[in-house]
Amino acid sequence: MEYISNTLGNLVEQTAFMNLTLGNLIMIAVACFFLYLAIRHGFEPLLLVPIAFGMLLVNIYPDIMLHAEDSANGTGGLLYYFYVLDEWSILPSLIFLGVGAMTDFGPLIANPKSFLLGAAAQFGIFAAYLGAMAMGFSDKAAAAISIIGGADGPTSIFLAGKLQQTSILGPIAVAAYSYMSLVPIIQPPIMKLLTTEEERKIKMEQLRPVSKLERILFPIIVTIVVCTILPTTAPLVGMLMLGNLFKESGVVRQLTETASNALMYIVVILLGTSVGATTSAEAFLNMDTLKIVALGLIAFAFGTAAGVLFGKLMCWATKGKVNPLIGSAGVSAVPMAARVSQKVGAEADPTNFLLMHAMGPNVAGVIGTAVAAGTFMAIFGVK
């Protein structure tokens, strides 16, 4: 009888119930809410499902993120080894490879002025940097936080790892991916506030056809120009353009399919679960996290507003040939931001098709955010 009692006692002690804190319960509830948003409402399920499940796991069983050096036998937890790939900036670079293989830069090549809209939307990054500095974050932490304004999760993780801001990598990544998934909710009110109905109804001229030679030369030229000026951008811009060259060359179909499908989804699983696993109650439930989330929202709103306002300027300069709504697509949430531009434009005029025009600033924003990250790395002397 005593043996049975001891055995049952040991079993009870091994359950998670004995170690759950109020903070863990709060984070479990947050994880379930994210799963609900992803599954029930379809808010970027490819991102939110693995992130939320990683969040769920680490708050039930913290040792799944146990660092190898803290382990009695020298073996870390499963998700710790996934997370190491985040710290080393391997997974974000592979994400860019997959994104490049999936991206059509044709609208940007056909309308190079889109680069200006993509650049304007990066204003949110530098606004967030100043805001983070004002809130008491160090200069490197402020730089890592500011990339949230570009709505670019992989770049946020990449820069946080490079600047050795791993203590806030979890909140940064969760905020960035959350705002990426909430683009359809956050952007429309800002877009409607800053534009008139007449502006939203503007129809743009059809884009010119882009030749195969232009498509092949584009990733090569961008790599040479950007990586020569800012070599620190090579891991992101280089991988992005390599993936696109796979796609546009037409001679490595197997590599294109692998990079844009199997490899991409494997990396998303590893990245999402490991990022979610950094959100233990002890690491996440603090004032710094609230500041980061608030700064991210402000930065994203500023970036959207800056893009729309620059779009209005281009509309005025071209005498009404540019719909300002495409400026909001300058953030690098691809293709969600472009779809939002299309949706808001169609609400004003159902016959208005802005999607391809918005894709130009959208893909320019991806390059712009990577360049912003490279600029911060150059400023701090990080390679």
Language model regions located:
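Interfacial helix-loop-helix linkers and transmembrane-helix boundary segments
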Residues: 39-48, 66-67, 81-82, 102-117, ...
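Membrane-embedded hairpin module used as a gating/binding unit in multi-pass transport
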Residues: 175-251
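Alpha-helical membrane segments and immediately flanking helix-loop junctions
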Residues: 88, 96-102, 117-127, 131, ...
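N-terminal alpha-helical transmembrane segments of multi-pass membrane transport
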Residues: 1-74
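Intrinsically disordered, low-complexity non-transmembrane regions of multi-pass membrane transporters
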Residues: 1-19, 25, 71, 75, ...
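Entry/N-cap segments of selected transmembrane alpha helices
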Residues: 32, 108-129, 280-307, 358-362
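Transmembrane helical segments that form the transport core of multi-pass membrane transport proteins
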Residues: 223-310
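Alpha-helical transmembrane segments
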Residues: 167-185, 295-303, 326-327
